[in-house]
């Protein structure tokens, strides 16, 4: 027997964002020049209990990388199962100074079975310009060893580890936010409306035309003469200004986890669709006696017991037919 249901989406987990909130500018944007920089290098982890490299890996690419990074390892070292070649990665934050410590990640680049219990020998970390900005050394910490979901998951975690504050900054990375008498605010999620709102909020706060949105991702901000010698104080005031970001109408479906996330002003046009044992209808902007909202459709689908596969198929058909106003993303 067919069930007449007004349904759209529900899966194992459904997350809804249908309300507007205000947030600080610092939570949705950053100043150009104040960003992380990536560092990388190749090092050697020692002290492994027979879980290191087998010595059978003879990749020309790997040998070339070792030569480029100045890694001098003997043939015997490569054959020892107590050592492992690793890639060392780190993000150095803006304004990091010489002597500060940063975290880093190590990952096996050969055929080691596990880095647990290993110790990373002194490894220089390079920036994109080829200069050394930090040096890493220390005990490798392995996360996820107690995860029992699958043997494959455990293996994957054992060949990736991290060093908590394991790298020392050796060279400052230049971070210049000021361009003449102005700075640029960059939105983490570019949006025309949000950019305009940020500029308007700043101008209202200081009661002068200081900010102007130049594109969906950037707002140019002129530093007032009163703050020319106190840029940090001015920027701290700007960061604390609250704005209401514009949220696009969007539905995101993750097929693997059965998660549906929807936000913004997602609307439904009138339609009738028959799918399997379901007949779905929206008439006059109503689902029965309720408004044709995503939340009401979700509730109906939960009660109906539709499978994630049903939901994804229905969403695709409705979206491709033009009855959903917004963007559908299936991951």
From Swiss-Prot:
Chief location: periplasm
GO cellular component: bacterial-type flagellum basal body, distal rod, P ring; outer membrane-bounded periplasmic space
GO molecular function, one term: structural molecule activity
Pfam families, alphabetized: FlgI
Superkingdom of source: Bacteria
Region forming the signal peptide: 1-23
BP term (GO), one: bacterial-type flagellum-dependent cell motility
Compartments, as annotated in UniProt: Periplasm; Bacterial flagellum basal body
Keyword annotations from UniProtKB, A to Z: Bacterial flagellum, Periplasm, Signal
Biological role stated in the UniProt entry: Assembles around the rod to form the L-ring and probably protects the motor/basal body from shearing forces during rotation.
Subunit structure as annotated in this protein's UniProt entry: The basal body constitutes a major portion of the flagellar organelle and consists of four rings (L,P,S, and M) mounted on a central rod.
Protein name: Flagellar P-ring protein
Organism (species): Thermotoga maritima (strain ATCC 43589 / DSM 3109 / JCM 10099 / NBRC 100826 / MSB8)
């Amino acid at each position: 027997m067919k069930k007449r249901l007004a349904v759209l989406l529900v899966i194992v987990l459904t997350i809804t964002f249908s309300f507007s909130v205000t947030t600080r500018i610092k939570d949705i944007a950053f100043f150009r020049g104040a960003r992380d920089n990536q560092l990388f290098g190749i090092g050697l982890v020692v002290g492994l209990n027979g879980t290191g490299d087998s010595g059978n890996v003879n990749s020309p690419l790997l040998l070339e990388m070792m030569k480029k990074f100045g890694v001098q390892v003997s043939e015997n070292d490569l054959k020892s199962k107590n050592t492992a070649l690793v890639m060392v990665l780190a993000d150095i934050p803006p304004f990091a100074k010489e002597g500060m410590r940063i975290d880093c990640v190590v990952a096996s680049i050969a055929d080691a079975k596990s880095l647990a219990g290993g110790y990373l020998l002194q490894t220089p970390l390079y920036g994109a310009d080829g200069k050394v900005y930090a040096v890493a050394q220390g005990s490798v910490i392995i996360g996820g060893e107690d995860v029992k979901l699958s043997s494959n998951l455990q293996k994957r975690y054992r060949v990736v580890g991290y060093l908590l504050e394991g790298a020392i900054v050796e060279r400052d990375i230049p971070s210049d936010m000021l361009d003449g008498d102005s700075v640029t605010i960059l939105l983490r999620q570019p949006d025309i409306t949000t950019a305009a709102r940020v500029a308007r909020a700043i101008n209202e706060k200081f009661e002068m035309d200081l900010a102007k949105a130049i594109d969906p991702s950037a707002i140019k901000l002129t530093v007032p003469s009163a703050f020319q010698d106190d840029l940090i104080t001015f920027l701290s005031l700007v960061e604390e200004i609250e704005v209401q970001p514009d949220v696009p109408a969007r539905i995101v479906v993750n097929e693997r986890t059965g998660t549906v996330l929807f936000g913004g002003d997602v609307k439904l046009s009138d339609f009738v669709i028959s799918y399997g044992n379901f007949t779905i209808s929206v008439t006059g902007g109503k689902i029965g006696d309720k408004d044709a909202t995503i939340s009401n459709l979700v509730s109906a689908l939960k009660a109906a017991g539709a499978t994630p596969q049903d939901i994804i198929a229905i969403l695709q058909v409705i979206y491709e037919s033009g009855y959903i106003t917004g963007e559908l993303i299936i991951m």
